[in-house]
Design a protein with these regions (language model features):
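Membrane-embedded alpha-helices of multi-pass transport/permease systems
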Residues: 19-22, 26, 246-257
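Loop-to-transmembrane boundary segments
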Residues: 1-15, 268
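Alpha-helical transmembrane segments
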Residues: 68-72, 161-170, 249-271
Length: 272
């Protein structure tokens, strides 16, 4: 029963991730090619574009998963890390660096201060006071994202246990907990602060905040680069998105197979 629940949680968590990812992938392809069938009149990715992206990601994920942990998954993960460092370095150097550094430290402090209250408070609005807006925000952001991440717990826990075999506890804590958290903070601070600075300074004039969420990153780079360089960086980001989605999906496939086979890594004995 526990294995079944873990499998369902992994499937649901991955589905949300891939759903968001293929939308951003479609927006990236549109930013590169300008093909009108990729987005509708409101700027949102079309159903056809998302289906094409989904087929592409799932096909690549299956091929990667079949190659095993030490081949396709490791190879794609190395590409993913290299491209991630390149994109983050770009925003650190060419983005709103000073504003981003301020945002980085303010965000850490606000997170530490707000986390206890946000972890224990559930707002219930009555339609007449500010708590109604807080309830709507909490449901759309805090509760939704926490539920999404919690659904990833069985998948990520088992995957980290598998790839961390032979590592010390110190190596695990630093490599799987501290460094990824810092990278996420740097990413949100520098990429987010660059977009916010463009809006506050009047350069964007609403182009970023009014864009579909899947296209906001590409709107940001369009504003800080020439058209040719923006297309080039869009290609890098699209490839990065694909490696993120494929490595997430193929790792999930690997863990689902392990759960379904009762923990056996040979995946020959079903456990359902």
């Amino acid at each position: 029963m526990v294995d079944i629940v873990a499998i369902l949680a992994t499937i649901v968590g991955l589905s949300v991730t891939i759903g968001y990812g293929v939308s951003q992938l479609a927006s990236g392809f549109f930013n590169i090619s300008g093909a009108e069938w990729l987005v509708d009149n409101s700027g949102r990715p079309t159903l056809m574009a998302q289906l094409v992206g989904l087929v592409l990601i799932i096909s690549a994920s299956c091929l990667s998963a079949m190659s095993g942990l030490k081949k396709g998954i490791k190879w794609l993960s190395n590409i993913n890390m290299g491209l991630s460092v390149f994109v983050i370095a770009f925003f650190v150097i060419f983005g709103a660096t000073f504003f981003a550094l301020q945002t980085f430290f303010y965000a850490i402090w606000d997170y530490l201060v707000a986390m206890p209250a946000m972890s224990t408070t559930v707002w219930s609005g009555n339609g007449e006071d500010p708590s109604s807006a807080l309830q709507s925000w909490q449901g759309a952001w805090t509760i939704f994202y926490w539920a999404w991440w919690i659904a990833f717990a069985p998948f990520v826990g088992l995957f980290l246990a598998r790839v961390s075999r032979g590592r010390t506890i110190r190596e695990y804590v630093i490599g799987a907990m501290i460094i990824p958290s810092l990278i996420c903070l740097v990413w949100f601070a520098f990429v987010g602060a660059t977009a916010i600075d463009l809006e506050l300074s009047g350069v964007a004039q609403g182009a970023i905040v009014n864009a579909d969420i899947s296209a906001q990153l590409f709107k940001t780079i369009n504003l800080i680069l020439s058209p040719e360089l923006a297309v080039a960086l869009s290609v890098v980001i699209v490839v990065l998105l694909m490696t993120f989605l494929v490595t997430s999906a193929d790792s999930g496939i690997l863990i689902i197979n392990t759960l379904a086979s009762g923990g056996s890594q040979s995946q020959k004995q079903p456990n359902m």
